[in-house]
Amino acid sequence: MSRLRRTNYQKYLADLAEQYGVEDKIEFLGSLSGEEMKQAFLDANVFVLPSTIENSPNSLGEAMLLGLPCVAAAVGGIPSMLENGREGLLYGDALDDKALADAVLRILQSADGGMALGRAARARALQTHDAARNAGELEQIYKTILQEEQP
């Protein structure tokens, strides 16, 4: 815990955990190296993204690339990244803690522990994060723009 208490926000989170009596159920990891972050993802059973505002969260893409079953609030660009029921589970109101808990339990209690969702998430992420494919699409966009008649 001492490693965590370096910022006001980190202190706020630790105090909140204590207030709700869950400090022994939460592990605050603090800053992680890239390899430590990858291992933390791989050690998880479910990736949860309860954000109220998101565009295209890198953390969701990273979890998908690593094949984690994902639960996320259906806000911003998240539904365009993750198909509900196929590549993970989305819940409607980001502040609905019961819906979030139900989605996590649905994955944990499923026969395969969310493995099928994780495999589908990885397949989609490999396709959408393919550097060569994305570079080719971007090149086509630029060529189209260059071919348009200039005023």
Residue ranges and their predicted role:
Residues R5-L32:
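Nucleotide-activated donor-binding/catalytic signature segment of Leloir-type glycosyltransferases, i.e.
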Residues S31, Q39-A44, L100:
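Short alpha-helical donor nucleotide-sugar binding micro-motif in glycosyltransferases
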Residues K38, P57-L65, P79-S80, R86:
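Short alpha-helical segment that forms part of, or immediately flanks, the ligand-binding pocket
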Residues F47-V48:
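A short hydrophobic beta-strand element within the catalytic core of glycosyltransferases
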Residues T52:
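Aromatic "clamp/platform" in nucleotide-sugar-dependent glycosyltransferases that forms part
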Residues P69-A72, L82:
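Short hydrophobic beta-strand element within catalytic cores of glycosyltransferases
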Residues G113-T128, N134-Q140:
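A short, well-ordered alpha-helix in the C-terminal region of glycosyltransferases
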